């Protein structure tokens, strides 16, 4: 990745963070809705990396909420930051890790996410996942068995 691509990615991360701040708290956090919610909060084609886009995805887990085992498009590199609460995560059959607010992790193309869940049964958790992915990729979360 060249310097301009890194600059574009940095600007995209800043914009995605601002978008998440603007989204605010949803009913998922008050326990009146499904235990998880996924929303695309930012997307922009990278003009200096033809065919690639940056997409910000806000994942919200109510207390005890989780996502089914999944993977992502083969082109997807993901940088994730926990915004609130704590997230349990397992990638490629490795150890289950717990990431707390302010901590981050990455997923690489082809990784399998076996566990993605709120680590708490009593408080909500939010995660911002920033994808660098083929622009043509529409489904960012794909099931696997």
Region roles according to the model:
Residues 8-18:
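Bacterial N-terminal signal peptides
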Residues 35-69, 75, 130:
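A short glycine-rich, His/Asp/Glu-containing loop-to-beta-strand
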Residues 74-94, 101-103:
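Glycine- and acidic-residue-biased ligand/ion/polar-headgroup-sensing regions
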Residues 49-52, 73, 81, 98, ...:
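Extracellular/periplasmic catalytic domains that process cell-envelope and extracellular macromolecules
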Residues 20-34:
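C-terminal region of N-terminal signal peptides and the immediate post-cleavage residues
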Residues 66-68, 88, 104-118:
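Histidine-centered metal-chelating micro-motifs
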Residues 95-96, 110-137:
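Ligand-binding loop in jelly-roll beta-barrel domains
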Residues 46, 50-51, 61-63, 93-111:
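Short acidic-glycine-tyrosine-enriched beta hairpin
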């Amino acid at each position: 990745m060249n310097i301009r691509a890194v600059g574009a990615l940095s600007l995209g991360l800043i914009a995605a963070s601002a978008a998440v701040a603007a989204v605010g708290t949803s009913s998922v956090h008050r326990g009146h809705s499904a235990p998880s919610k996924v929303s695309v909060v930012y997307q922009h084609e990278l003009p200096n990396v033809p065919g690639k886009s940056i997409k910000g995805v806000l994942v919200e887990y109510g207390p005890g909420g989780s996502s089914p085992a999944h993977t992502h498009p083969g082109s997807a590199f993901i940088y994730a930051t926990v915004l609130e609460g704590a997230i349990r995560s397992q990638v490629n059959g490795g150890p289950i890790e717990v990431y707390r607010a302010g901590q981050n992790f990455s997923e690489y193309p082809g990784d399998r996410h076996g566990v993605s869940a709120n680590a708490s049964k009593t408080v909500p958790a939010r995660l911002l996942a920033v994808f660098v992915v083929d622009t043509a990729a529409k489904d960012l979360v794909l099931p696997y068995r």
